[in-house]
Amino acid sequence: MRTGMWFDSGRVCLDLLATDGPEGAGSGCREGTRDGLRDGLRDGLSDGDALRLWLVGAGLVPDQTPLGRLGPDWVEAFRSLRHDVGTLVRAELAGTGPEEEALARVNAAAAGPPPGVCAVRNQEGHLVRELCGGVECAGMLATVARDAVELLTDPGDLALIRSCEGDGCARLYLDTSRGRRRRWCSSELCGNRERVARHRRRVREVAGT
């Protein structure tokens, strides 16, 4: 799995949003100006190799599925879908209603046929999942767009969407924890940072007394 990628939102479409820019919406690496960087923030879908790793990590492409070179057209298509899904999800959370052009584009992507799945035997004789007919960009986009449509039209899941409380983190996730008490995208990352920051504040307060 590529460093900085995150697959714990509870929805594939929210995992896609997590590749966008600042930590919690992407990798969070501030570096110079190179390909894949926007305003000094690393884009989690910086190139075809990054997109390939995301597709596998998100479970959209079964392990061992041969993936050819994913060109700039793939990257641009997924970035565009990410932007539109993010626009729609945040509009719903803010209660401002859908942005019609973004909605039309997501609906158009969702209307395409998703890739077919079949069971084949591997070299050990076990049945494994495989995509039938190869991996096509439109099919991959349709899978993510359909997940977004399902989320946007499900009041129950919409009510579970939370934004990470970590400082500088904008990741969105479904809070399915007991009592709906989840505060961070990751207890090990943002949660641990918050605990460390809290400890440092206490130390400074004690030192100042």
Label the predicted regions.
Residues 175-182:
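Short linker/helix segments within small regulatory modules
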Residues 155, 176, 191:
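Residue-level signal for short amphipathic helical patches enriched in basic/charged
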Residues 188-206:
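Basic DNA-binding region of bZIP-type proteins
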Residues 161-166, 182, 187, 193:
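Residues immediately within or flanking Cys/His clusters that coordinate Zn2+
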Residues 1-163, 170, 207-209:
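Short helix-coil boundary/hinge micro-motifs
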